[in-house]
Amino acid sequence: SLVGGVLISLVCLRQTDLKALIAYSSVAHMGIVLSGLLTMTYWGLTGSYALMIAHGLCSSGLFCLANISYERMGSRSLLINKGLLNFMPTLSLWWFLLCSGNMAAPPTLNLLGEISLLNSIVSWSWITMIMLSFLSFFSAAYSLYLFAYSQHGKIYSGVYFFSVGTTREFLLLMLHWLPLNLLILKSNFCMLWIYLNSLKKMLICGVNDMKLFILDRELFS
């Protein structure tokens, strides 16, 4: 899964379609999630759960931004969606915040998930550090590639007007970004399902022990 994540990251660096790049970045992140799950450790499970929540928010926000650009430019190609800092300056901040979240920059929940996953995967085998270093580097590379190529450079010559975002779009992006950054302050919510699962197992074991105790008393009475 780590090798697959590195290969998909290389594919991301060759994409010229906004939505394809974001979709491939999701596949690359799921490579490290799968590795963490396969270690079958506590940190692996909690890190995978946290990263899936974080990437669900971050990836959804990036898809939203890609759709906003598509509605105005009429194309998803990076060859046309460039120079957006001049065309849509009000949305450039959101591109930066969500692209930095996609590369697990602090204080996003992605950072917490990746630290937990790195801990679990390296504890399973130190050789995985090689692939993890490549995966982390290329994750930052394609996130910066997405932001720099779309926001900077000369604006597409077929565009002759200036565009601003609407209140609905800003609210939608804010509701993606706020949980992504605030959940790290209360990260035990991300581990809640593990606590509930452990409590369920304890209750089942307690009920089974009680049944055995009652059965033993009936046999010896």
Curated annotation (Swiss-Prot):
GO terms for molecular function: NADH dehydrogenase (ubiquinone) activity; ubiquinone binding. The keyword Nucleus does not apply. GO terms for cellular component: mitochondrial membrane. It catalyses: a ubiquinone + NADH + 5 H(+)(in) = a ubiquinol + NAD(+) + 4 H(+)(out). The chain crosses the membrane at residues 20-40, 45-65, 78-98, 121-141, 170-190. It is an enzyme of class 7 (translocase). It is a multi-pass membrane protein. Its main location: mitochondrion. GO terms for biological process: ATP synthesis coupled electron transport; electron transport coupled proton transport. Keywords: Electron transport, Membrane, Mitochondrion, NAD, Respiratory chain, Translocase, Transmembrane, Transmembrane helix, Transport, Ubiquinone. It is found in: Mitochondrion membrane. Its EC number is 7.1.1.2. Coiled coil: none annotated. Pfam families: Proton_antipo_M. Core subunit of the mitochondrial membrane respiratory chain NADH dehydrogenase (Complex I) that is believed to belong to the minimal assembly required for catalysis. Complex I functions in the transfer of electrons from NADH to the respiratory chain. The immediate electron acceptor for the enzyme is believed to be ubiquinone. Belongs to the complex I subunit 4 family. This is NADH-ubiquinone oxidoreductase chain 4. It comes from Anopheles arabiensis. The lineage of its organism: Eukaryota, Metazoa, Ecdysozoa, Arthropoda, Hexapoda. The gene is ND4.
